[in-house]
């Protein structure tokens, strides 16, 4: 989920580390936790009534009678096992088998790439950094990453096709994530244990980021000529894996997708200082032939990658992918979303009409609220989403009604921030690729890497 500049579009940092820290392990054990709506989009609010057998041993000689008894026992056992569900050994279609069932001994490790820390680090700092990643923390990230891989594989094969509605694609992705996490998010607080890291972004053509189907909007149908960005996050215990890809059915856009994918991979190889990132140079070496014209691919300059904190998709660091004077550096113990965006347009994004989603501003208390509907809505937000970004679909899934006036009041008071879709000029096409990387004592781990991208 991209962070727009200069506004930032990010939550306040609120990181928390495990109280008992251990050195990073390459293969840790798995964690045990596994019409009014449209008006609100436009900022208009109307009237709202808010107020193996048991005895079987190697080397034991048995008589024929004993063998017969054992056969009878095993037959009973087999009969009993037929009546129950057989243990799953592979994922279903659609994905519904919890990941903890498929990976009882540990989750896959991401791609490990060389990490050259050229900064001076004292022995004390090195010892502290090596303890930042405990086994449960790494397990949470790796579980979330594998869920992302399995769900997006299903989405690419079964959901994302010409003629499909974006609503059905979003719901298919989100249903898969919740099933594999083992948390449906319907009970109070359940969505904070595991589930969606933020609403599924499904952005067509000149819409580069921050669009999702919402109640009150028209049902958008995916066409063969469209370029679709798919951006979704998975979290386990607040540890968010953020990854995105682009789909185009027309080979006309192959160079656009290749340019952005290569730029993202270039960004992943950056070692420490964020001003070293030169993904834009890679991206802008490509051209796209559109309607008989050769159009250079432009790097979108006012949207960036970002660090990720616990329960906060946007931390305090931005990761621009154009040449810059950013003094920030990547440090061991941090998590980053490395993403790049390319366009056949002007390469600058503006806010569009509508609202993608909302994020709680943890720095602003709600104690001064007077509107009853705003107080009630804030209580629901804090109990179910905390500082995770959410959308109206998620509120209505919980059964929340008549929330429009209360939401406007929360936004007006700075307690909740709204996110608008980000667009380039009409008629242009945009693409995005993104991965989450972890910097730990074992190196740089591209946690969301898969065979697809």
Curated annotation (Swiss-Prot):
Binds 2 divalent metal cations per subunit. Has a high-affinity and a low affinity metal-binding site. The true nature of the physiological cofactor is under debate. The enzyme is active with cobalt, zinc, manganese or divalent iron ions. Most likely, methionine aminopeptidases function as mononuclear Fe(2+)-metalloproteases under physiological conditions, and the catalytically relevant metal-binding site has been assigned to the histidine-containing high-affinity site. GO terms for biological process: proteolysis. Its EC number is 3.4.11.18. Its cofactor is Co(2+); Zn(2+); Mn(2+); Fe(2+). Residues 46-57 have a biased composition (Acidic residues). One of its GO terms (molecular function) is initiator methionyl aminopeptidase activity. A divalent metal cation 2 binds at residues 242, 306, 339, 434. It is found in: Cytoplasm. Keywords: Aminopeptidase, Cytoplasm, Hydrolase, Metal-binding, Protease. GO terms for cellular component: cytoplasm. Residues 1-12 have a biased composition (Basic and acidic residues). A divalent metal cation 1 binds at residues 231, 242, 434. The keyword Cytoplasm applies. Its main location: cytoplasm. It catalyses: Release of N-terminal amino acids, preferentially methionine, from peptides and arylamides. InterPro entries: Creatinase/aminopeptidase-like, Met_Aminopeptidase_Type2, Pept_M24, Pept_M24_MAP, Pept_M24A_MAP2, Pept_M24A_MAP2_BS, WH-like_DNA-bd_sf, WH_DNA-bd_sf. SUPFAM superfamilies: Creatinase/aminopeptidase, Winged helix' DNA-binding domain. The keyword Hydrolase applies. PANTHER family: METHIONINE AMINOPEPTIDASE 2 (PTHR45777), METHIONINE AMINOPEPTIDASE 2-2 (PTHR45777:SF1). Cotranslationally removes the N-terminal methionine from nascent proteins. The N-terminal methionine is often cleaved when the second residue in the primary sequence is small and uncharged (Met-Ala-, Cys, Gly, Pro, Ser, Thr, or Val). Belongs to the peptidase M24A family. Methionine aminopeptidase eukaryotic type 2 subfamily. This is Methionine aminopeptidase 2-1. It comes from Aspergillus terreus (strain NIH 2624 / FGSC A1156).
């Amino acid at each position: 989920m991209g962070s727009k500049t200069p506004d930032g579009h990010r939550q306040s940092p609120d990181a928390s580390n495990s109280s008992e820290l251990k050195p990073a392990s390459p293969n840790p054990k798995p964690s045990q936790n596994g019409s009014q709506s449209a008006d609100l989009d436009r900022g208009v609010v109307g009237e709202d009534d808010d107020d193996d057998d048991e005895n079987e041993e190697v080397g034991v000689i048995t008589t024929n009678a004993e063998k017969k008894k054992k056969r009878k026992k095993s037959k009973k056992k087999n009969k009993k096992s037929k009546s129950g569900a057989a243990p799953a050994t592979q994922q279903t279609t659609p994905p519904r088998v919890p990941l903890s069932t498929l990976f009882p001994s540990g989750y896959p490790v991401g791609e490990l790439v060389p990490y050259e820390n050229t900064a001076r680090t004292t022995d004390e700092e090195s010892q502290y950094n090596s303890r930042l990643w405990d086994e449960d923390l790494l397990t949470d990230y790796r579980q979330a990453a594998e869920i992302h891989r399995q769900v997006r594989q299903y989405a690419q094969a079964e959901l994302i096709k010409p003629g499909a509605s974006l609503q059905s694609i979003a719901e298919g992705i989100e249903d898969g994530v919740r099933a594999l996490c083992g948390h449906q998010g319907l009970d109070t607080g359940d969505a904070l244990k595991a589930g969606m890291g933020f609403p599924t972004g499904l952005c067509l053509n000149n819409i580069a980021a921050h669009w999702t189907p919402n109640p009150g909007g028209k049902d958008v149908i995916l066409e063969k000529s469209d370029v679709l960005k798919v951006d979704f996050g998975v979290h386990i215990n607040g540890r968010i894996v953020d990854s995105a890809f682009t789909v185009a059915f027309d080979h006309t856009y192959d160079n656009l997708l290749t340019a952005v994918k290569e730029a993202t991979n270039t960004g992943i190889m950056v070692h420490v200082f964020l001003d070293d990132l030169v993904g834009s140079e890679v991206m802008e070496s490509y051209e796209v032939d559109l309607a008989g014209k050769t159009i250079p691919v432009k790097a979108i300059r006012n949207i960036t990658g970002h660090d990720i904190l616990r329960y906060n998709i946007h931390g305090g660091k931005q990761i621009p992918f154009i040449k810059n004077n950013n003094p920030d550096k990547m440090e061991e113990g941090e998590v980053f979303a490395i993403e790049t965006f390319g366009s056949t347009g002007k390469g600058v994004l503006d806010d569009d009409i509508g609202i993608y989603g909302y994020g709680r501003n943890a720095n602003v208390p709600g104690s001064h609220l007077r509107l009853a509907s705003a107080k009630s809505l804030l209580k629901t937000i804090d109990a179910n989403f905390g500082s995770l970004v959410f959308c109206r679909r998620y509120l209505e899934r919980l059964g929340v009604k008549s929330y429009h006036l209360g939401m406007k009041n929360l936004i007006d008071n700075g307690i909740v921030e709204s996110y608008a879709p980000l667009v380039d000029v009409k008629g242009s096409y945009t693409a995005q690729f993104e991965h989450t990387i972890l910097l730990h004592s074992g190196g740089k781990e591209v946690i969301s890497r898969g065979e697809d991208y």
